[in-house]
Amino acid sequence: MTLTDYVREVSLADFGKPFKHQASWNRRLRTTGGRFFPKDGHLDFNPKILEEHGETVFRQIVRHELCHYHLYFEGLGFRHKDQAFKELLDQVDGLRYAPRLQSHQANYLYICQHCGQAYDRKRPINLAVFACGRCHGRLIEKNQS
């Protein structure tokens, strides 16, 4: 079964409405589970969500994107802040936020000497320039093991 067929199946089962466009995988998505494109109606999904969190969570993300999709084509509020979106998302048991991916690997750990706030970073920072955002204390680098 292709991704588009899966989305069509979820749309009919959970919304009772057909999905008439295309759905595709997009490995470049980092922090979102999916995206809806109003211009042409297609949906993109993050395959890492399915790999790391399983089919149940992925189905909830498909429902989330289908809420955007169906509300847009019905002429109702399809953005996250709109009441129609929030109500439909609750009705179909969609996820409001995508779960964090475990594949995020921090290479650097910085600790504030004053308040102990920890900062994970993929790239190194210049300790002579940057300070703690909470208390403006000095940062030190801790070795990641």
Swiss-Prot record:
Keyword tRNA processing tagged: no
Reported cofactor(s): Zn(2+)
GO biological process, one term: response to stress
Active site location: 65
GO cellular component: cytoplasm
UniProt keywords, alphabetically: Cytoplasm, Metal-binding, Zinc
Lineage: superkingdom: Bacteria
Main location per the UniProt record: cytoplasm
Subcellular location, record wording: Cytoplasm
Gene Ontology molecular function, alphabetical: zinc ion binding
List of residues binding Zn(2+): 64, 68
InterPro entries: SprT-like_domain, Uncharacterised_SprT-like
UniProt KW Cytoplasm keyword: yes
Cofactor note: Binds 1 zinc ion.
Start and end residues of each SprT-like domain: 5-140
Family: Belongs to the SprT family.
Protein name: Protein SprT-like
Organism: Streptococcus equi subsp. zooepidemicus (strain MGCS10565)
